[in-house]
Amino acid sequence: MSEPYEELLSGEWHLRLGPGERHERICARLHEIMLASVANYPATKLLPPRMKIPLNQYHTIRPDLALVTSANNRLWLAVEIVSADDHRADTVIKKQIYEDMKVPRLWMVDPRYDNVEVYFANEYGLVLGAILAGDEILTEKLLPEFQLTVRELFLA
């Protein structure tokens, strides 16, 4: 198990439990595939897992995976791997923060059900675009080289 860490969510510090072994394997696999996918896209940077990202004075988040634009470090893809014993912070609180901050993409990777919820921002907020499982392929149109079957992700 990894070390606990803190996030500033809606002006309050929240102590988050250290992710478990499966969580960390999934995170490492996702980073490995994503790193290869962004290598040819200098406009995008992949941040280290759970790097502190201050959004404003009320929110400092630490997503499991984050892609930012190289020009201004603006977060454009956040990935949260949901922990069964600490899921509310990711699935409710942080999801609302991502929506309020108009983050263009959010993936909720849920090892409890071996699925991935893919959200896209529009003028009304975050919209659920797909719930992927099994042999369905997780892709991102802004990163044409990124393709990963959900089954492969959860075998990590």
Each language-model region and where it sits:
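Gly/Pro/Ser/Thr-rich low-complexity, intrinsically disordered segments predominantly at protein N-termini
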Residues: M1-A156
